[in-house]
Design a protein with these regions (language model features):
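Substrate-binding and catalytic surfaces of secreted/luminal carbohydrate-active proteins
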Residues: 13, 104-108, 117-123, 129-130, ...
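General structural concept
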Residues: 22-33, 43
Length: 330
């Protein structure tokens, strides 16, 4: 439970609509949250928690979960994606082997309900599954994850599911790997040219995404859609964590996504990106930065001003800590 002072779900729904946020990611299937977003225009990505993956090895359990936790709210609540686990593959322990079987059971349950074409499913990974690659055209997956990545990629391809990844340029900055302008989308000229492709890049977000594009292409999955399920910037807790840098990163990210085109190597691929997070999380474990990725305080005032434009029918995505646990106390 990462936050004990959040507003009520219906207040959150009003805030999200008022902010012109069209796509929302939550981390479980909290019924109060699903109910709050019924009869809104917001598209919801709901999650299966890591703690539930063992139970999701049972088809009857998953069938029951879909029947009781999703179908009563659908389609009044516009659920478009189910994420199965969060960065599970990175842990390289026995639990990583639970992800694909759990997803198979989710697919089977969706097929039974005839919803497999309406609700997409995948599992968000962190960028740790990629080998450090420079230039991007030499992007490959880390061999450490081969045993779990091979069945996962085959499964995603077979079901036309997106590859979901959490990308945080902030950590490259925090580790001293990059210049601030390059990380904050402030470089007007190209920072490097990929000698293999001749393509130039002026921000690390595109470079990281193209490492993934090439890693997929090298495995013959170049047509697989990518969704960035988390990115963001903290406002406290490290020298580079500040309100100014967070506002600059997220504002420039939104502009970059809205302006198109895609990345240097995949210019025709529409960028789908979720900003983490809607609220600060006062109980989250770990460094102070982890508690300070929010765009809003729990009282729903802004940590900093961020405009979510509605341009040409394209609108914005947010990952919300609102439902990190289904046992949130309201």
């Amino acid at each position: 439970n990462a936050n004990n002072n959040l507003p009520q779900p219906d207040q959150v729904a009003q805030l999200v609509e008022k902010q012109n946020i069209q796509y929302l990611r939550i981390y479980d299937s909290n019924p109060k949250v699903l109910m709050a977003f019924s009869n809104t225009t917001i598209e919801l990505m709901v999650g299966v928690r890591n703690a539930d993956l063992s139970a999701f090895q049972s088809q009857s359990y998953v069938d029951s979960w879909l029947r009781n936790s999703i179908l009563p709210y659908y389609p009044a609540t516009n659920i478009t994606h189910i994420t199965v686990g969060v960065e599970m593959v990175d842990s390289l322990d026995d639990a990583t082997n639970l992800v694909v079987p759990a997803m198979r059971n989710v697919v089977s349950a969706l097929k039974t309900a005839n919803l497999q074409d309406r609700i997409k499913f995948s599992t968000p990974l962190s960028s740790a599954v990629l080998s450090p690659s420079y230039p991007p055209s030499e992007g490959v997956f880390s061999s450490s994850y081969e045993n779990v990545l091979r069945p996962l990629l085959d499964f995603l391809e077979e079901n036309q599911s997106p590859f979901m990844v959490d990308l945080y340029p902030f950590y490259a900055m925090n580790n001293g790997d990059s210049s601030l302008d390059y990380v904050l989308f402030k470089s007007s000229s190209s920072i490097f040219v990929d000698g293999n492709t001749g393509l130039s890049c002026n921000n690390i977000f595109d470079a990281q995404l193209d490492v993934l594009h090439f890693a997929l292409a090298h495995r013959n999955f170049s047509r697989m859609k990518i969704i960035v399920t988390e990115t963001g910037w903290p406002t406290r807790g490290s020298p580079y964590a500040s309100i100014d840098n967070a506002q600059t990163y997220n504002t420039n990210l939104i502009r970059h996504v809205m302006d198109g085109p895609g990345t240097p190597a995949w210019p025709h691929e529409e960028l789908v990106v979720y900003i983490f997070s809607l609220f600060n999380e006062n109980l989250k474990q770990g460094p102070e930065t982890e508690r300070n990725f929010g765009i809003f305080y729990p009282d729903m005032t802004s940590v900093y001003n961020l405009v979510f434009p509605d341009k040409g029918g394209r609108s914005w995505c947010i990952a919300s800590s609102q439902a990190l646990d289904s046992d949130l106390q309201y």
